[in-house]
Amino acid sequence: MSRRHRTFPVKVGSVTIGGTAPVTIQSMTNTDTKDTEKTLAQIKDLVEAGCQLVRVAIPDEESVNSFKTLTQFSPVPLIADIHFSYQLAIKAIEAGASKIRINPGNIGSRQRVAKVVEKAKTHNVPIRVGINSGSVEKNLLQKYGGPTPSALVESAVNNVMMLSEMGFGDVVVSIKASDVNTTVKANQEFATRLPNPLHLGITEAGTIKQGTIKSSVGIGTLLSHGIGDTLRVSLSGSPIEEVSVARGILSSLNLAEGPRIVSCPTCARSNISVEDLASTVEDRLKDLNTSLTVAVMGCEVNGPGEAKEADIGIAGSKEYGVLFKKGKIIDRVPKNQLLEVLSRAIDEYIDEIHSK
């Protein structure tokens, strides 16, 4: 892990993005915003899953009315996602948005952007400048021959500078493409240019499987180089899955508390059903906010030997299963009791941690 790139902090309601604040997890509702009850229920589900900021699309006036109610009852700050209409951006701020996401390039004239900025200033609402490969200005596409990393960066810098000229500095930036390499290179380049907090993501990443792979590689690469202050994993599926993947990315880089499951790929030596046991353990621990490494190994060659760094683990043998802690065997039990014994040992270990 590289030392974290220095950015300035931006307050989004009660949550800070950038500076020395931890990397935060965002997601976006996929309900009809006008359905206030269903959207609020999804917001609460996202928060329960570990989401700290939730973005809501505001496509029309009726959605603004619903959004106002949502801001009053949401347990976390809400971000209004705006495209094309500067009037909707202004109304979303008035409705209680803690941040707005715009692409100044599709809001309209400089005068219209200035009206949004003035309203944001009045309400102390930060702006995220969202630059996507599909919405880069035509002159930059011609200059660079397409949505290259340099084209994306120049678009982002130009928009940040425009807001700065209007006296507005609370700007978070996102530079996203569906191509992982383009996204990584663009964010790396931007990080050398300006100190604005960076929102990471791979846009239109795809299905849960494909999107998880692309997001983990792209976002993980940037975070491992110290770049990034908040993230959203974009998946064609439930936003709850987005939060789960985001938590996994942060946990795997030791940037957030959470469980890690270590399991062997299995071979002819396996004496237990590693896949089933590991999947069950993973599901049981998915909401845990404690750093804990649990190993599920097929034989005593892999566990506890190769999994000795795990806090708690199990391994199979021909006649029984073993339970180990920090590489030392602490119990031998019938294999059909391994899951029960492991679950109890995990609970006891967590209690030990919390009692210290």
Swiss-Prot record:
GO molecular function: 4 iron, 4 sulfur cluster binding; 4-hydroxy-3-methylbut-2-en-1-yl diphosphate synthase activity (ferredoxin); 4-hydroxy-3-methylbut-2-enyl-diphosphate synthase activity (flavodoxin); iron ion binding
Name used for this protein in its record: 4-hydroxy-3-methylbut-2-en-1-yl diphosphate synthase (flavodoxin)
Source taxon at top rank: Bacteria
Family annotation (Pfam families): GcpE
Organismal lineage: Bacteria, Bacillati, Bacillota, Clostridia, Natranaerobiales
Natural source organism: Natranaerobius thermophilus (strain ATCC BAA-1301 / DSM 18059 / JW/NM-WN-LF)
Secretion signal span: none
Gene name of this polypeptide: ispG
Co-factor(s): [4Fe-4S] cluster
InterPro entries: Dihydropteroate_synth-like_sf, IspG_bac, IspG_bac-typ, NO2/SO3_Rdtase_4Fe4S_sf
One biological process term in Gene Ontology: terpenoid biosynthetic process
